[in-house]
Amino acid sequence: MNNKILFLIVCLNAFFIEAQTSMEAKKLLENVSKQIESYDNIKFEFNYVLNNRKEQINQESKGEITVAGDLYKLDFLEATQLYDGKSLHTIIPENEEITITTPEEGADFGINPTALLHFYKEGYDYQWDITQRIEGKKIQFIKLIPTEEDAEILSILIGIDVSRKHIFRIIEVGINGTYTTLTINDMKVNTPLLEDYFVFDKKKYPDYYIND
């Protein structure tokens, strides 16, 4: 009887500890989201790595993002995306082509920078993961596990700079063994921007084909 009671106590303790760490993980993510939303704008460079050892794939790219509310400018994979709140303009200099879409239609192009603030709020369970010191920063990782059985990813690790409450790194692990890593570098906040910074100016691209 004593062994059964002890086993039950251990199980209950494990349950409550897991629930507590899950709440702590969610609270930290919410604090990060509030911190970033408090800025007029954010601008940062990033490194993007796609790796799959089985398929012998290792791709590295760099990019830059400026976000102000729902507006953003994204330079990534030799293309520029401008979202002015209504239309998404994808500018590809190599092809001298510009595609105009709605955000929903253009969502498959790559990443939506504004989604970094909110994507974790639905569809995931939370776990308090490892703490690492990277580049002199204390980085606390939060593990997100999809609640849907048919999800295409196993987990997402979000590394948070504890002192600044900024996202430092996001690691997505796919069910096919693909690791996608986004590392944020050189973040600047409340940078003075021109009023038309996110506005597409057709005059700058006189010879481009516009597909709308």
Label each PLM-derived region with a short phrase.
Residues 1-2:
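N-terminal secretory signal peptides that target proteins for export/translocation
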Residues 5-14:
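Sec-dependent N-terminal signal peptides
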Residues 16-57, 70-71, 204, 209-212:
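N-terminal leader/targeting segments and the immediate start of mature chains
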Residues 47-53, 75, 91, 145-147, ...:
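A generic structural motif
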Residues 62-110, 180-181:
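An acidic-aromatic
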Residues 103-135:
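Flexible, surface-exposed loop/linker segments and immediately adjacent secondary-structure boundaries
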Residues 127-131, 135-210:
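Gly/Pro-enriched, hydrophobic low-complexity segments
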